Amino acid sequence: MAWKDIPHLQLDCYRGRDDRFRDVYGRLFWDKPSSTITTKFIKISNGRFAHPDENRGLSIREGATIQSFPKEYIFKTNSIGIAAKLIGNAVPPEYARRLGKIINKVEV
């Protein structure tokens, strides 16, 4: 089910206008949390992934940093698209580390 199937969740100006473009454009902010990083974060036309100051999408390294990959982490691919998929589909490493610590405490 998509938002278009639930009219009460739509803004009045979009109700009944199923023929419209549904993607969202937006810019990230330096002082606010990031949008969820998806596999298409390198394209500004697929979400709120425009760089905060520059007129471009995020780089692979910027997306990886938002997802908490270490700065020295190397994605072993020559394809920007595959690297973006790896980053967008990943559980953020810092989240996984913290969750693992909690699970360890509970199981001990």
Task: Label each PLM-derived region with a short phrase.
Residues 1-108:
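C-terminal target-recognition/interaction regions appended to catalytic cores
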